[in-house]
């Protein structure tokens, strides 16, 4: 991607579909198009370091989908379709990578279950 003078960049549930080996390069390109004080908003599905807690949050999300009228079959089919395509990472992995590519400060500013938005300041 080509970016110039990007004061705000928003990546909503995008990075999780980029192969892990290319994520740093993409974020480095974004950062290089930003000036100090510019902002990146990064929203992603997270995986938690505690497997039991991670599974619990996934089940809560599935319960939410059921309440919205999705069948168990639809939920299972979507999960299988995303199985090897959506590769989530931990909060720590995201924060470390953002620092590595040159963002000075970053942290989660919003989270619901295992979906989070991070803010990173160039």
Residue ranges of model-derived segments:
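Hydrophobic beta-strand segment of the Class I
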Residues: 9-10, 98
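Short catalytic micro-motifs in class I SAM-dependent methyltransferases
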Residues: 12-16, 44
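A short glycine-rich, Lys/Arg-flanked "PGG" loop and its adjoining helix->strand segment in the class I
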Residues: 24-36
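Conserved beta-strand signature within the Rossmann-like core of class I S-adenosyl-L-methionine
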Residues: 34-46
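C-terminal alpha-helical "lid/dimerization" subdomain adjacent to the S-adenosyl-L-methionine
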Residues: 46-101
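Core SAM-dependent methyltransferase catalytic element
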Residues: 95-122
């Amino acid at each position: 991607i080509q970016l110039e003078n990007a004061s705000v960049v928003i990546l909503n549930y995008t990075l999780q579909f980029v192969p892990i080996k290319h994520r740093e390069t993409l974020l480095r390109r974004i950062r290089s198009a930003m000036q100090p004080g510019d902002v990146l908003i990064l929203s992603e599905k997270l995986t938690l370091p505690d497997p039991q807690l991670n599974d619990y949050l996934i089940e809560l999300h599935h319960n939410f989908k059921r309440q919205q009228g999705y069948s168990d079959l639809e939920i299972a089919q979507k999960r299988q379709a995303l199985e090897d395509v959506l590769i989530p990472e931990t909060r720590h992995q995201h924060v470390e990578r953002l620092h590595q590519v040159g963002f000075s400060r970053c942290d989660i500013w919003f989270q619901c279950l295992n979906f989070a938005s991070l803010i990173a300041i160039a």
